[in-house]
Amino acid sequence: SDGRNAAADDKASDLIGLAVRGCCSNPACSVNHPELCGRRR
């Protein structure tokens, strides 16, 4: 596997993780995206 691609994937998932945490701490966003915050209905 290509090390550069792995590093890019890690960076992307870090950014997604930050966005998800920001969304989950925002009630309006977490209500719209319960699957991101582990709140399954």
Swiss-Prot record:
The modification Cysteine amide is found at C37. The keyword Secreted applies. Keywords: Acetylcholine receptor inhibiting toxin, Amidation, Disulfide bond, Ion channel impairing toxin, Neurotoxin, Postsynaptic neurotoxin, Secreted, Toxin. Expressed by the venom duct. One of its GO terms (molecular function) is acetylcholine receptor inhibitor activity. It holds the Pfam family Toxin_8. InterPro entries: Conotoxin_a-typ. It is found in: Secreted. Residues 25-27 are annotated as: Ser-Xaa-Pro motif, crucial for potent interaction with nAChR. Its main location: secreted. Residues 1-21 form a propeptide. Coiled coil: none annotated. Disulfide bonds join C23-C29, C24-C37. The cysteine framework is I (CC-C-C). Alpha4/7 pattern. Belongs to the conotoxin A superfamily. This is Alpha-conotoxin-like Qc1.5.
